Amino acid sequence: GAGVEPVVFLSVIGADRTPLVPHARLESWRVEAGLETTFLRASFFMQNLSTTHREEIREGRLAVPAGDGKTSFVDARDVAAVAVRAIQTGSTGAYDLTGPEALDYEAVCHLLSSVLDHDVEYTDPSIPRFLASRYRRDRDFAKAGVMVAIYTTARLGLADRGTDDVRSVRDRPPTDLLTFICDNRSA
């Protein structure tokens, strides 16, 4: 190696089963090169709600083309804690990191509404409408395209898988979405 082993590599959940995502190629390259690596395959970060979707949530809505599909959100703080443990122990392999439950976006909006000082409504825009709206907001078509891919996996029922990997590494349950929302209500 290059004297920088082992490496902890942040990937995406399903990279081992989805060759189209760039993470799959990077994971394969590291394995084929014989490089000691811990792969952290994270589900959808809870932090996306308090960053990427912050303004629309403040406006009382969350518009994503996820249909009634569920997502097993993960707190980036849990992912970071698993990364630290992997570095401390020198463990290698792969961890699929999710939260404790899979929720649809109606349920997400219900949780947001229960904590915030206003109601948040879920709307399920068409993909063209979502792309246009995100482009107007961010001026970044590539980002909007990635978001469509992410929400399409939820729509198709491919984002609802949960694992015990956070619990097994940290000896405590992963953060649930309600706790995350309470911790970040001022965001």
Where are these regions (language model features)?
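A hydrophobic C-terminal alpha-helical subdomain
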Residues: 127-187
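Oxidoreductase cofactor-interface core, primarily capturing Rossmann-like NAD(P)-dependent enzymes
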Residues: 2-6, 12-121, 125, 132-137, ...
